[in-house]
UniProtKB/Swiss-Prot annotation:
Residues 26-41 are annotated as: Required for response to orexin-A. This is Orexin/Hypocretin receptor type 1. It is found in: Cell membrane. PROSITE patterns: G_PROTEIN_RECEP_F1_1, G_PROTEIN_RECEP_F1_2. Widely expressed. Residues 1-46, 106-119, 183-213, 322-336 are extracellular.
Length: 416
């Protein structure tokens, strides 16, 4: 998976012979003006690309910042899963704020304009963010797998989650050091190196051709293929537990909490508004937990699927380029450029997609997003939520009766 800030490795003005391109001194200024006017100035479709990058930049920064604020401001949202979601959002903010602008300029100008130091720093941070995202998604899947499939084997806590997050960043910062070590900035036109940074490229430089093949093969397996395969297996088992069979202990709870409809009707006649009996209440709580776990699992599976789809093109292109040596003498250069450019944009689009997924699939995050935008859209503010809660409280009596009746009817059906 190539760091998306280094597409400038494909030179803008390659020479057919591979020899340095020399210009007479009198023509340097005129040549630079020609390059800017007819070659580097964004074309029409590149303006579309710029607009797409700007949209992703704004959505990713605002959305992921709101995710972090939602968990920070609300103690009831400080769950283990949400701690990992915040960590994923922090990685998305990092890559969006630092790497996205550089990647956009490189894709448009096909030149590295930021010098040698940032040539090492930006690709390194890009690789670190990829590692953090993959490890975070892996820990989320592992936590859900233990909680749902093997709840008695491991007890996840917020303290352990925070320790895991620190470990994720430490491992990612350490294992991606080789990415920074091999990045070098060089100029395709040495004669113009002192006049402009146009057509400078930031690319990997290895001592032997075998090393990049080994490194990028391992990178693809460790940061994409293997973790996604393991996470797919984990979510498959989670899916079976939540939708195919009962959570461990639910069947016994079903029998234990069951009350006959006649007993339930007798309890209802004792008052105008009676709360569900303790056993029925316990079962209702268990059903509510089941529904909440299903919603959370559904949201996390969508996040994982979107991540896999967004990172698939750049992963495949990087393996083809670095391992199999393709695209060096591409006959259709524009098509190759378009593929790499679109794949770079998809990486950043994933950062913008996550907050959107949370908004549509998580009621708690959706309420917090509405509250955050209440200053601009009063109808979406806390007032509407308060009115909704008031109506809910007024109808709690009737809802509780209906819920208990539905539960007991379901129990009767299951046990008959």
């Amino acid at each position: 998976m190539e760091p998306s800030a280094t597409p400038g490795a494909q030179p803008g003005v390659p020479t057919s012979s591979g020899e340095p391109f020399h210009l007479p001194p009198d023509y340097e200024d005129e040549f630079l003006r020609y390059l800017w006017r007819d070659y580097l100035y964004p074309k029409q479709y590149e303006w579309v690309l710029i607009a797409a990058y700007v949209a992703v930049f704004l959505i990713a920064l605002v959305g992921n910042t709101l995710v972090c604020l939602a968990v920070w401001r609300n103690h009831h949202m400080r769950t283990v899963t949400n701690y990992f979601i915040v960590n994923l959002s922090l990685a998305d903010v990092l890559v969006t704020a630092i790497c996205l602008p550089a990647s956009l300029l490189v894709d448009i100008t096909e030149s590295w304009l930021f010098g040698q130091a940032l040539c090492k720093v930006i690709p390194y941070l890009q690789a670190v963010s990829v590692s953090v995202a993959v490890l975070t998604l892996s820990f989320i899947a592992l936590d859900r797998w233990y909680a749902i499939c093997h709840p008695l084997l491991f007890k996840s806590t917020a303290r352990r989650a925070r320790g895991s997050i620190l470990g994720i960043w430490a491992v990612s910062l350490a294992v991606m050091v080789p990415q920074a070590a091999v990045m070098e900035c060089s100029s395709v036109l040495p004669e113009l190196a002192n006049r402009t940074r146009l057509f400078s490229v930031c690319d990997e430089h290895w001592a032997d051709e075998l090393y990049p093949k080994i490194y990028h093969s391992c990178f693809f397996i460790v940061t994409y293929l293997a973790p996604l395969g393991l996470m797919a297996m984990a979510y498959f088992q989670i899916f079976r537990k939540l939708w195919g069979r009962q959570i461990p202990g639910t069947t016994s709870a079903l029998v234990r909490n069951w009350k006959r409809p006649s007993e339930q009707l007798e309890a209802q006649h004792q008052g105008l508004c009676t709360e569900p009996q303790p056993r029925a209440r316990a079962f209702l709580a268990e059903v509510k937990q089941m529904r909440a776990r299903r919603k959370t699992a559904k949201m996390l599976m969508v996040v994982l699927l979107v991540f896999a789809l967004c990172y698939l093109p750049i992963s495949v292109l990087n393996v083809l380029k670095r391992v199999f040596g393709m695209f060096r003498q591409a006959s259709d250069r524009e098509a190759v450029y378009a593929c790499f450019t679109f794949s770079h944009w998809l990486v950043y689009a994933n950062s913008a997609a996550n907050p959107i997924i949370y908004n549509f699939l998580s009621g708690k995050f959706r309420e917090q997003f509405k509250a955050a935008f209440s200053c601009c859209l009063p109808g979406l503010g806390p007032g509407s939520s308060a009115r909704h809660k008031s109506l809910s409280l007024q109808s709690r009596c009737s809802v509780s009766k209906v819920s208990e009746h539905v539960v007991l009817t379901t129990v009767t059906t299951v046990l008959s």
